[in-house]
């Protein structure tokens, strides 16, 4: 049975439905909406999920007895896709102790209820304990389902309030897709790996650190992959300044993978300065003409140096400065890549620049296609590894539960045998040695 709210403050009213039959009351009366302009900290859940007023009727959801399957009770919340609002957080006051929230089939989170009050239900003539629980969604959504959980096989659930916090959605936010990797919870992956007793290889750990840095700084991971896989450093930094300009691939496609080359902390500053000097000067004193023809190299030394610092600050989780004591392990991947590009950076003559300009369109297309294929391949690998780790973890849990069940069954069987035959020792227990203290005729005991 589907119902709608009657709150006039919102132009697009969300719908609320239940997988169980509504035996008493209406879900419309239990749904309370908060205005979209409020933030999660601007309202008090204690007040919104306060005990109901005396005499207030509760909504009763009953299990369908015609359905033999033991389906749990689900609540379905849905907003119109063109309503301009999304669900940001949910709170429920009901007899169900806990609730789980799902976005489609994807688990979102669990909220454990707190005892609020005890009310007397006139229809059932029993005391009902109401629990309050609330959950803030990591990302707002147009639709979600709520699983109500209770101890024991409850045949009905009493609902007092369903509080939904709505958030305004801008027109451009619906068309923008989330950054690659933002949907992957790396902390969860790390926890699963540690629980299985596994450790990440150095390469996998570097990849995870790079994705975590991208999630934290909201940097398109394609730019990081282009930098790591051999894009020229100065064109990568120009791409940071103008999103419409893409760097071309370095001619030296056989450049060693940056993580395999050696780098010491003593020559970091020297390599950076060398890179800046080479990037701002062309041989033969033809700086102005070749810069105009190629339209690639920046004309200002300080401008390029600032771009270099900004690129490093955006790539690393910590701010890069001249006096910062950042561990070498954090600077190593980016600086190795930068220095390897400096060693293979050769500025050609005028004909080479003209050739670069002629093939500029083809290389831009190649960069875009390669970035797309690399990002797609990386996402598939991460998703496959997460599914594999989750399957191994579930198999391990099932095995442990099975062993525990067998152990409990053995103990119960032993206890029942002992109760049925109290005088006979149970099977598997060695007999105790009793000494009567009597001596034999030969004096031995």
Swiss-Prot record:
InterPro entries: PAAT-like (IPR028043). Its EC number is 3.6.1.-. It catalyses: ATP + H2O = ADP + phosphate + H(+). Residues 432-445 have a biased composition (Basic and acidic residues). PROSITE patterns: ABC_TRANSPORTER_1 (PS00211). It holds the Pfam family PAAT-like. Residues 426-445 are annotated as: Disordered. Keywords: Cytoplasm, Hydrolase, Mitochondrion, Phosphoprotein. Its main location: cytoplasm. GO terms for molecular function: ATP hydrolysis activity; identical protein binding. It is an enzyme of class 3 (hydrolase). One of its GO terms (cellular component) is cytoplasm. It is found in: Cytoplasm; Mitochondrion. The keyword Zinc does not apply. Homodimer. Interacts with ABCB7, ABCB8/MITOSUR and ABCB10. ATPase that regulates mitochondrial ABC transporters ABCB7, ABCB8/MITOSUR and ABCB10. Regulates mitochondrial ferric concentration and heme biosynthesis and plays a role in the maintenance of mitochondrial homeostasis and cell survival. This is ATPase PAAT. It comes from Homo sapiens. The gene is PAAT.
């Amino acid at each position: 049975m589907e119902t709608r709210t009657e709150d006039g403050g919102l132009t697009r009213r969300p719908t609320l439905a239940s997988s169980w039959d509504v035996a008493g009351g209406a879900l419309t009366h239990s749904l309370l909406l908060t205005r979209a302009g409020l933030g999660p900290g601007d309202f008090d859940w204690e007040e919104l999920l306060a005990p109901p007023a005396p005499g207030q009727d509760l909504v009763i959801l009953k299990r369908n007895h015609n359905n033999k399957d033991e389906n749990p009770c689900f609540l379905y919340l849905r907003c119109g896709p063109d309503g301009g609002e999304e669900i940001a957080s949910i709170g429920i006051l009901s007899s169900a102790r806990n609730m789980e929230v799902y976005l489609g089939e994807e688990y979102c989170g669990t909220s454990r209820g707190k005892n609020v009050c005890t009310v007397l239900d006139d229809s059932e003539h029993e005391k009902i304990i109401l629990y309050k629980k609330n959950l803030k969604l990591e990302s707002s959504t147009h639709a979600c389902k709520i699983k109500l959980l209770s101890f024991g096989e409850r045949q009905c659930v009493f609902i007092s309030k369903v509080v939904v916090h709505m958030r305004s959605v801008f027109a451009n936010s619906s068309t923008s897709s989330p950054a690659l990797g933002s949907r992957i919870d790396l902390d969860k992956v790390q926890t699963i790996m540690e629980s299985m007793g596994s450790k990440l290889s150095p390469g996998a750990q570097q990849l995870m650190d790079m994705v975590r840095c991208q999630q934290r700084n909201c940097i398109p991971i394609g730019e990081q992959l282009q930098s790591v896989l051999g894009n020229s450093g100065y064109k990568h930094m120009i791409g940071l300044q103008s999103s419409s300009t893409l760097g071309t691939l370095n001619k030296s496609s056989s450049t060693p993978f940056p993580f395999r080359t050696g780098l010491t902390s003593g020559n970091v500053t020297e390599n950076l300065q060398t890179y800046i000097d080479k990037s701002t000067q062309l041989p033969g004193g033809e700086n102005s003409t070749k810069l105009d023809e190629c339209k690639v190299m920046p004309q200002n030394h300080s401008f390029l140096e600032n771009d270099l610092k900004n690129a490093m600050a955006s790539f690393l989780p910590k701010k890069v400065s001249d006096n910062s004591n950042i561990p070498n392990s954090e600077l190593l991947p980016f600086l190795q890549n930068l220095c390897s590009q400096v060693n293979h950076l050769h500025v050609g003559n005028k004909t080479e620049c003209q050739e670069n300009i002629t093939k500029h369109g083809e290389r831009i297309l190649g960069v875009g296609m390669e970035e797309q294929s690399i990002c797609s391949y990386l996402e598939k690998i991460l998703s496959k590894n997460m599914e594999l780790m989750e399957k191994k973890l579930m198999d391990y849990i099932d095995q442990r539960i099975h062993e525990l069940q067998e152990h409990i069954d053995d103990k119960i069987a032993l206890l029942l045998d002992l109760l049925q035959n109290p005088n006979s020792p149970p099977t598997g227990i060695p007999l105790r040695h009793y000494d009567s203290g009597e001596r034999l005729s030969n004096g031995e005991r």
